[in-house]
């Protein structure tokens, strides 16, 4: 039906399909190694970085590049990449998921990994306060018990998820300042998520992201397993950085 409509990757065919078969996504996603990327900002950039690594590794995959990141759109993407019998033609799926829709997607897709980029206030009109967005993501993770998490160590909201769910966690982050910034002017999360006292920052990378610590309860940025250790060039077009995983340094252009 989705192929006949010629609108794979858009919401309408997926909505129609889900009306006919509410568990369609669960059927189509079965036995597909799936990585979900969610968060307020950076989902598309992060997805394209993962995608490039899959291309270079020769992995058979599809991705929802069309931007259809709601439950209906993700269902449509799986459908157009599956046979008429419901078997996906690819071994892997890279799914960019809207934060609010993620909690529903997790009920049907059993992802192998979930990347959470950050939680910012620019979703205010749709989702209310940042704590509500954070709760949506937590529920999505709770619905994905087999997933390994990749969490942004620089985001005090994002890292709080590690203590809220039992999933194994890998932290990533930026171990060097990028821009001069005043936290009190830019921060969406100036106060400790545990005790509500103001954070102290050793440096800021962007907004409320950076090396934070609470001087009262001790809640602080975890040490990332993989991090940007050097930013050589950054402009509107690209950034030249060095990644460090504790064993080797890897130059990269983003």
PLM regions and their residue ranges:
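Adenine nucleotide phosphate-binding catalytic loops in nucleotide-utilizing enzymes
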Residues: 170-254
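Phosphate-binding loop of NTP-binding sites
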Residues: 1-173, 181-192
């Amino acid at each position: 039906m989705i192929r006949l409509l010629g609108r794979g990757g858009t919401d309408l065919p997926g909505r129609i399909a889900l009306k006919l078969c509410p568990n369609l996504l669960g059927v189509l996603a079965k036995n597909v190694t799936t990585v979900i990327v969610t968060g307020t900002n950076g989902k598309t950039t992060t997805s394209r970085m993962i995608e490039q690594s899959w291309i270079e590794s020769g992995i058979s995959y599809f991705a929802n590049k069309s931007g259809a990141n709601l439950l209906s759109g993700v269902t449509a993407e799986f459908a157009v990449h599956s046979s008429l019998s419901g078997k996906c033609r690819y071994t892997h799926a890279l799914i960019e998921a809207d934060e609010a829709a993620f909690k529903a997607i997790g009920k049907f897709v059993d992802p192998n990994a979930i990347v959470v980029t950050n939680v910012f206030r620019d979703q205010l009109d749709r989702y209310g306060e940042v704590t509500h967005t954070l709760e949506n993501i937590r529920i999505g993770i709770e619905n994905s018990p087999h997933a390994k998490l990749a969490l942004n160590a620089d985001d005090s909201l994002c890292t709080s998820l590690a203590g809220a769910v039992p999933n194994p966690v890998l932290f990533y982050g930026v171990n060097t300042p990028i821009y001069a910034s005043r936290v009190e002017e830019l921060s969406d999360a100036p106060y400790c998520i545990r005790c509500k006292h103001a954070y102290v920052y050793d440096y800021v990378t962007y907004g409320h992201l950076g090396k934070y610590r609470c001087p009262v309860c001790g809640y602080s940025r975890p040490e990332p397993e993989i991090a940007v250790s050097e930013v050589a060039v950054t402009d509107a077009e690209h950034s030249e950085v060095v990644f460090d995983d504790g064993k080797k340094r890897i130059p990269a252009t983003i």
